[in-house]
């Protein structure tokens, strides 16, 4: 595994505090994921991504910036990655999935604010996550009052752009959201220095749709009994989808699905046939939560 400490230092990170977070993740990951029985071989790639989560992909983002490109940090799922990619940028999802970052958020947010928001702000202010140090622009959305306030605070420390998400689904709300996307396009073009063309947008739409199709294929394999991949591993892959290179991610997910579909044909699975299932809805659950 490469040594990324100099990169972290160059990003202005608190390396000593970051090491405290890095010290607990390997044991947690082994207990929750690696010790599962009969895991698919195709999970090796995704395990490697997490094993070097603050190294390989951040280094790619840094290299992209050194080559003159721009990186956009996005929260939630409402920011259209297609526009960012069409403008020559890279979109990377930012999560608030660790309690480790909550105290940092509590220095500027009320204690009764939800942990997701506090962790998202804390990850930036604590300087312990490279994904929160790299972006040229952070793009938030108005899904709740807590986030609205959080973006005001984040804007004091980093460039922030907020998309105004309508609260209803009326025609006027759809039109308002369409206008928000057009305004975002203008902002992305301004930051990136590149115009979005019909051709570049066509390519980026196909790229992101291929990623979505790969995820849909993965989820469809879990309809079978016995299930060929655990829910925990499926959640892990869905999180990696937010920040991995979209073309590489789609290729590796499809390769995994080839293996899973072969297991289905053989009647093999990671759990007994008709094993009980738990339905989880809402926001994606991020490692280590």
Task: Label the model's feature ranges.
Residues 123-187:
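Acidic/His-rich segments in extracytoplasmic proteins that coordinate ligands and/or metal ions
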Residues 112-127:
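Glycine-rich, highly charged phosphate/nucleotide-binding loops
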Residues 74, 93, 162-164:
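Structural signal for conserved beta-strand scaffold positions within catalytic alpha/beta enzyme cores
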Residues 95-101, 164-169:
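Short, acidic/turn-prone active-site loops that include or flank metal/cofactor-
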Residues 2-70, 186-289:
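A charged, amphipathic alpha-helical module
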Residues 100-110, 170-176:
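Short, charged, surface-exposed secondary-structure boundary motifs
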Residues 70-75, 138-141, 280:
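Short, hydrophobic beta-strand segments that form beta-sheet elements in well-ordered domains
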Residues 66, 78, 83-97, 104-105, ...:
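Redox- and metal-dependent alpha/beta enzyme cores, enriched for Fe-S-associated oxidoreductases
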């Amino acid at each position: 595994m490469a040594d990324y400490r100099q990169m972290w230092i160059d990003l202005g990170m608190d390396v000593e505090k970051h090491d405290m977070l890095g010290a607990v993740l390997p044991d947690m990951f082994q207990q929750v994921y690696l010790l599962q029985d009969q895991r698919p071989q195709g999970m090796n790639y995704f395990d490697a991504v997490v094993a070097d989560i603050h190294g390989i992909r951040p280094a790619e983002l840094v290299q992209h910036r050194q080559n003159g490109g721009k990186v956009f940090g996005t929260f939630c799922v409402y920011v259209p990655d297609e526009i960012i990619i069409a403008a020559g940028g890279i979109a990377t999802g930012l999560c608030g999935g660790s309690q480790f970052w909550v105290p940092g958020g509590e220095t500027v947010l009320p204690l009764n604010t939800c942990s997701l928001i506090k962790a998202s702000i804390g990850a930036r202010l604590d300087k312990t996550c490279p994904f929160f140090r790299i972006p040229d622009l952070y793009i938030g959305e108005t899904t709740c009052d807590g986030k609205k306030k959080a973006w005001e605070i984040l804007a004091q420390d980093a460039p922030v752009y907020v998309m105004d998400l309508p609260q209803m689904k009326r025609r006027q709300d759809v039109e308002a959201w369409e206008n928000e996307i057009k305004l975002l396009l203008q902002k992305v073009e301004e930051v990136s220095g590149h115009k979005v063309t019909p051709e570049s947008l066509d390519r980026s739409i196909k790229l992101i749709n291929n990623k979505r199709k790969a995820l849909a294929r993965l989820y469809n394999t879990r309809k079978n009994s016995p299930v060929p991949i655990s829910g925990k591993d499926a959640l892990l892959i869905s999180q990696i989808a937010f920040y991995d290179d979209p073309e590489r991610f789609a290729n590796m997910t499809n390769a995994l699905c080839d293996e899973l579909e072969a297991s289905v044909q053989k009647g093999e699975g990671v759990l007994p046939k008709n094993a009980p299932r738990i339905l989880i809805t809402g926001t994606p659950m991020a490692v280590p939560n």
